[in-house]
Amino acid sequence: MATSKLPVVPGEEENTILMAKERLEALRTAFESGDLPQAASHLQELLASTESIRLEVGVTGESGAGKSSLINALRGLEAEDPGAALTGVMETTMQPSPYPHPQFPDVTLWDLPGAGSPGCPADKYLKQVDFSRYDFFLLVSPRRCGAVETRLAAEILCQGKKFYFVRTKVDEDLAATRTQRPSGFREAAVLQEIRDHCAERLREAGVADPRIFLVSNLSPARYDFPTLVSTWEHDLPSHRRHAGLLSLPDISLEALQKKKAMLQEQVLKTALVLGVIQALPVPGLAAAYDDALLIHSLRGYHRSFGLDDDSLAKLAEQVGKQAGDLRSVIRSPLANEVSPETVLRLYSQSSDGAMRVARAFERGIPVFGTLVAGGISFGAVYTMLQGCLNEMAEDAQRVRIKALEDDEPQPEVSLEVASDNGVEKGGSGEGGGEEAPLSTCRKLGLLLKYILDSWKKHDSEEK
C-alpha cells in the first residue's frame, strides 16, 4: 500500500492502519480511565476500521487513449450517466480524478491526466500526478505501444509495482484493416499481431511477462474486456485488510509466506478484540460479535489463500488441471465450509492451547492470567485462529505444489513463523510476589498497551 496521503474521495472515510492504531490507543485510554461506554464506542470504530484499507489504482496513458471511457466501462456506466468520468475528443482530465469501483468500494480508480498533454508535459508528468502514490496501474494505449507507454511501464517497474496493459480502440484497428485488406482479413490474426507487438515493446522496456488486454470501450462484451474484468476481480480479493499484498497470486511461495505473516498479525488483533468484547458489561455485545467475527475472519483467510471454489477453479484452468485434483490435497476441516457448527467445534478444542497462550502472555503482562481466568476468551480465540491459519497456509502450499507438480520439483517449505507473533511456546515462568488487585479496565488497558508497544517495536524495526 502506498503510505502517502491521497486526496480523500468526498463522503468517504480514509481507513488506514495508522487510524486503527489511533483508535486502539483511544480504546486503551478509555479502559484505563474506567469509561466503559466510551470504550464500547471506540471498540466498534476499531472493528469497522479493520474491514477496509484503500487500494488506489492509477489509470494512466497518453492523451486520447480512452482512459475515462475505460473507467466508465469497468464501472458499468455510460458517458452520460450520473457519476461517470468525463469523456471527449479533447483531453478532459486536467488533474487526478477519483472514481469508486462499484463491486469493491475500497478500491478507487484514479483517472490521471494524459501523459505529454499540454497540462502535463512529459518531463513533469510523474511529479505532477504524484505517480508514486498509486498502488497499481492500468496502462492504457490506443496504439501499438510507443515511447510514452514504455516510459510509463519502466517507471512502474522501478517502483516495484504491477500493471495491466490495456490496448483500447481495437475495433477501429480491425475496421481499418478490413478496409485495407478485405480479401485476406482475419480478425484473430490481426488481434494476435497487435498483442505480439505490444508484448515485444513491453519486454524491451523490461516487463518480463506483460499482462495485455485488447478492448473496445464501446463494446465491453467483446474482445478481452470480459477477461480483463474477471482477472481484475480475481486479483482484488474481497479481503480488504491487506489489499495490496492479498492480491498477489497464490502460486508464489514468497506470496504465501508474506500472506501468512500479515494474517498472523490479524489473528492477534481479532483475538484481542473478542477478548475485550467479552470483558465489556454491555448486554448482547459479545453475542452479536463473537460468531460473526470468527466466521468472517476464517472465511477471509480461506479466500486469501485461494482455497475457495472460485479460486481453485481459476488456478486449475491456468495450470491445465482439474479443480478436484487441487482440492484433493486440502486437509483443513474448513476446506468445504466455514460454518458456525465447525467454528464452535474448533473453538471448543482450543482450551489447552488457550492456557498455553495465557501463560505466555502472563510473562509479559503478569495480570493477564487473572484476566483470562475471569472468563476472557482471548486464549481460545487466538489458539483456534492460529491453528486454522497454520493449516490453511500449509493447504495453500500443498495446492501450489500440486499445481506445479509437472514442472520442476517444488520443495515443501514450512510456513511456520518462528515465534507465533511473539507468543513463545514454552510454559509459564515463576511468578513474583503478591500484587495489588487491579480492575478489569486496568488489566485490559495494560493488555492494549502491550499490543501497541509490540506494533511500535515492529514499525521501528521495519524503518
From Swiss-Prot:
PROSITE patterns: G_IRG. GO terms for molecular function: GTP binding; GTPase activity. Residues 53-235 form the IRG-type G domain. Its main location: other. GO terms for biological process: positive regulation of flagellated sperm motility. The gene is IRGC. It is found in: Cell projection, Cilium, Flagellum; Lipid droplet. It comes from Homo sapiens (Human). This is Interferon-inducible GTPase 5. Asthenozoospermic patients show a decrease in IRGC protein abundance in semen samples and a loss of colocalization with the mitochondria which suggests a role for IRGC in sperm motility. Its EC number is 3.6.5.-. CDD domains: p47_IIGP_like (cd04104). Required for sperm motility and therefore male fertility, via positive regulation of spermatozoa fibrous sheath formation.
